[in-house]
Regions:
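N-terminal cofactor/phosphate-binding cores enriched in small/glycine residues
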Residues: 1-6
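His/Asp/Glu-rich, glycine-adjacent segments
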Residues: 7-8, 13-205
Length: 206
């Protein structure tokens, strides 16, 4: 938020990833919004929006300068990283949902997910990575400055040594897979594929 708004946390309203909200008497995240519904996630799940963001971002200023012609879309595996940099009035914001393995959004942006997003979630769901192996890119001896594999502080409930099998420790795709997948390099590939789909379907850069 600070980087894309040019304002300090004291000015842009986003003082952390989460904090205690005195008005509601509970902990909130920077983007949680009880008035908004999640699209593409679990039924009844709380939605996300930039309603706590004060001021404008580069994306908002692009929309203003172009008379609304510019297209701004936020995409990230983290909700806050998709929502806050893209500002108050983007054409959409999408992030990964580890409960369903889908790219999701909220009713702040749409009444329903665009058809191309639904198609991506159906045809190119991260469950397709089930059983893939995450191996080192280079021979083990190359990584002389890296810490030992299976370090004492590692707390993964899955594999702790290369190669890693992306299966969440289960026999079929499910929430544990999605959580493990999110921390693997395959997630970066998946995110890039989604971004390419957004460029093609939203006519970005045209």
């Amino acid at each position: 938020a600070t980087f894309m708004s040019g304002a300090t946390p004291a000015m842009d309203g986003i003082v952390g990833n989460e904090w205690y909200d005195r008005e509601s008497g509970k902990r909130v995240t920077s983007v949680s919004d009880d008035k908004i519904k999640l699209l593409g996630g679990r039924e009844g799940a709380t939605g996300m929006s930039p309603h706590r963001l004060v001021g404008t971002t580069v994306g908002d200023e692009m929309k203003l300068a172009s008379g609304g012609k510019a297209k701004v879309i936020g995409i990230s595996y983290k909700d806050r990283s998709a929502i806050l940099p893209s500002g108050k009035r983007p054409n959409g914001a999408y992030w990964f949902n580890a409960e369903t393995g889908n790219f999701v959004s909220s009713t702040y942006y749409f009444e329903d997910l665009p058809a191309w997003v639904k198609a991506f979630n159906h045809d190119r769901h991260c469950g397709a990575y089930f059983g893939k192996t995450w191996e080192r890119l280079l021979p083990e001896g190359i990584y002389q400055r890296s810490e030992p594999d299976d370090a004492a502080y590692e707390k993964s409930p899955y594999d702790r040594r290369f190669p890693y099998t992306i299966n969440g420790g289960e026999e079929k795709p499910g929430r544990k897979l999605y959580n493990q997948f999110e921390a693997s390099p395959f997630a970066n590939e998946h995110l890039v594929n989604f971004a390419k789909a957004a460029i093609e379907n939203e006519g970005l850069g045209a």
